[in-house]
Design a protein with these regions (language model features):
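Long, low-complexity eukaryotic regulatory regions
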Residues: 1-128, 162, 171, 181-416
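Residue-level recognition of beta-strand microenvironments
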Residues: 177-179
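Active-site-proximal segments of catalytic enzyme domains
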Residues: 107-175
């Protein structure tokens, strides 16, 4: 009995490790805007659903008409995060998955980017709403029903073109298309890869069509921190895309193929979006930020260090100067995996001091490729001709062949 009692006492004194049960984290898709909350939920649902669907050897005609649709009806459940009733419809899921793959986008990374609340950004065009993903890799744009219809027609030609070109294109990279229904209101949203860099600041921005009539930025637009300027502003600024003969040849080959493709589809209204990152200006900004940090440290040292001087190796200022110098040297480095639209100027791409000229990084892409030249556009062209005269080269609305020729000539003249 004594032995049993001793054993029980020994066991009672033995320390037992307590295990805390870890529950898997659940995405809440919490957002102030219910539409964006549903968008994030929809991306998460549709991408995860695709992970269980076999990748076909080739896409069939039905894949360009297919869709996935889900209706959610909740009662007193998760209402603090999502609307009680909503619908999500994804168009052509297999087609867009294939496009993402061809553009080198992993679905897991795509999911991570778009299940964090995006932020609203200043629209490049009137009417549509634009959002930027939290990591700045993707742009979400709202579409009209007419644009969605055009997108379906365009997609049937766009996908084989991307395949034939091995994704070597300046056309928008369309990655997903959704219809979201919240409070009985339907919204269409398309996901596009961001033309600009996630880490390199764009200091100047132009939207170029190659036409001259009514092609100046408005006074309201110019009030923005980085306004979107237009053709006449570009010419007045005397800007040149300085990438050299070899760079020009490669760019014009890609641009020529894209524009020929659009012209054959009777598409007009597209433009070249040009963003310019000024490396010298970025360097100045980085040095100014460094100087401000050092100033703050000096104020802190004089007020709170008690007059005790640190030796140089221990000084936080010394460490900060080294890290700031490294930051400045890395300030304008292109990431080839992310900055796919980036082209360095001749001076930026060459060794230090070997080539004169502006140290710029250019971001270029064709935008707005869903305007079909039909009866409405023909009427618009006639109206503008009456107003401005028969100078077709100066009017933005023109027949597809004239539009493409003028567009390419303008860009060709802008490159040196």
């Amino acid at each position: 009995m004594n032995g049993t009692q001793g054993l029980m006492e020994a066991l009672s004194k033995t320390k037992t490790k307590r295990f805390k049960v870890k529950h898997p984290k659940r995405k809440l898709f919490r957002c102030n805007d219910p539409l964006l909350g549903v968008f994030m939920w929809g991306v998460n649902h549709t991408v995860r659903e695709l992970q269980h669907i076999h990748v076909p050897v080739m896409l069939m005609p039905d894949d360009f008409r297919s869709f996935s649709k889900i209706t959610i009806k909740n009662h007193a459940y998760n209402k603090e995060n999502l609307p009680s009733n909503f619908k999500v419809k994804e168009y052509c899921p297999l087609v867009f998955r294939n496009l993402r793959e061809r553009f080198g986008i992993n679905d897991s990374d795509f999911l991570k980017s778009l299940t964090v609340p995006p932020r609203s950004i200043n629209p490049l065009r009137g009417g549509a709403n634009y959002y930027l993903s939290a990591d700045r890799l993707y742009v979400i744009k709202t579409l009209t029903t007419e644009e969605v219809e055009e997108m379906h027609h365009f997609l049937k030609q766009y996908h084989p073109y991307i395949v034939d070109r091995h994704a070597k294109t300046l056309l928008p990279q369309y990655l997903a298309l959704y219809r979201l229904t919240v409070d009985n209101m339907e919204s269409y949203m398309v996901v596009i890869r961001n033309v600009f860099s996630a880490h390199l600041k764009v200091h100047k921005k132009y939207d170029l069509k190659g036409s001259r009539v009514d092609r100046e930025a408005s006074d309201k637009e110019r009030e923005k921190t980085c306004p979107t300027l237009k053709d006449n502003d570009f010419l007045a600024d005397g800007v040149k895309i300085n990438i050299g003969e070899e760079g020009k040849e490669g760019l014009m080959e890609t641009l020529g193929a894209d524009v020929d493709f659009l012209s054959k589809l009777n598409i007009i209204g597209y433009s070249l979006l040009l963003g310019i990152h000024d490396m010298d200006r970025a360097m100045e900004d980085a040095l100014d930020a460094q100087a401000e940090e050092e100033e703050d440290d000096e104020d802190y040292d004089s007020a709170g260090s008690g007059g005790v001087a640190l030796t140089p190796p221990e000084s936080p200022n010394t460490r900060r100067k080294i890290s700031s110098s490294m930051m400045v040297s890395q300030a304008s480095r292109i990431d080839p995996n992310l900055d796919i639209y980036a082209i360095p100027s001749r001076a930026a791409g060459a060794g230090a001091g070997t080539v004169s000229g502006p140290k710029h990084i250019y971001f270029l892409s064709i935008m707005d490729v869903l305007t079909h030249y039909g009866i409405k556009k023909a009427a618009a062209k006639a109206a503008k001709t009456v107003k401005y005269g028969s100078d077709v080269e100066g009017i933005s609305t023109a027949e597809p062949e004239q539009y493409s020729r003028r567009f390419l000539a303008f860009v060709n003249d802008a490159i040196e």
